[in-house]
Amino acid sequence: KLTIERLWTTLGELRSMGITRIEGDLILDGSYFQVDGGFPAFEDNGDNPHAPFLVEPSAYLTNLNLMHFQVRADERGTQGCRTTAYLSLLSHEQYSASLIRSLLADLGVVVSGGDLNGVTPEDARLVMKTTSPDLVTMVRDINKWSSNVMARQLLLTIGAENRQEDESDDRVAGIRVIYDWLENKGINTAGMVIDNGAGLTRHGRITARQGAQILEHAWNSAYSADLMASMPIIAMDGTMARRLRNTGMDGEGRIKTGYLENVRSIAGFTRDSNNTT
């Protein structure tokens, strides 16, 4: 999750080394992910192909590839609340290169060349680096705010880290790893369909029994506390902040939501009158 704040801090370290000019091109390397088969098509864009939930995963991804717009009336118009929108308008490569250049310029660093995509040379010298937030933090952001692109990034990362010699698509490799893991935990995956790592699909399939088995395993696992903390709390935060308010359920469950046009779904944990989860 390379946000603008993390990127600014990282580039600031570069500037603190005394670097004020980079002779040559700004070259972005997106070769970490291999997605030879492309991504499954999703046509339900809500008449907004630039919506945040449609951002596709990429090794170039920075700041979720989003631009932030605020619209408000000046003194000539009727005063009222401002309108805020987040849109994805540029390719990952364009967005990342432009953002890096802009931040470097703000820091007083000039790049003399243009923007290119390429592979890092084997003899390149590492000057500085940054690391991702830990997995617990990433999963919390994914679940609390139902981030499709972050979930899909996670799937591709699983694939990239476990890619076999005969595999050339990290999406497919990641799905294979998940199926193998589930089967190893005793969960029958017959009929289950995972196609993109998020709920952004009309082809995904899972039975109620399979879902319940996965949740039961999660509840009894060594990482249950981390998973519980990542899920939205009824009527309190995340995607559940405004749902089931004043129903007597406030704070009484941790629920992951799902939403597509004409589809609503929830899954998670709560307690009954006998205090049973």
Regions flagged by a language model, labelled:
Residues 64, 75-78, 271-274:
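Short acidic-glycine loop/turn motifs at beta-strand connectors
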Residues 177, 189-277:
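C-terminal soluble interaction/assembly domains
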Residues 28-32, 44, 111-124, 233-235:
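Short, glycine/proline-biased beta-turn/loop segments that scaffold the active-site neighborhood
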Residues 55-57, 145, 149-150, 262:
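Short, solvent-exposed loop/turn segments at the edges of secondary structure
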Residues 1-58, 65, 109, 159-210:
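Mid-domain, small-residue-enriched loop/turn segments at the edges of structured enzyme/sensor domains
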Residues 69, 74-226:
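A small/polar active-site loop signature that marks catalytic segments
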Residues 49-51, 90, 130, 255-260:
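Short Gly/Pro-enriched turn/cap motifs at secondary-structure boundaries
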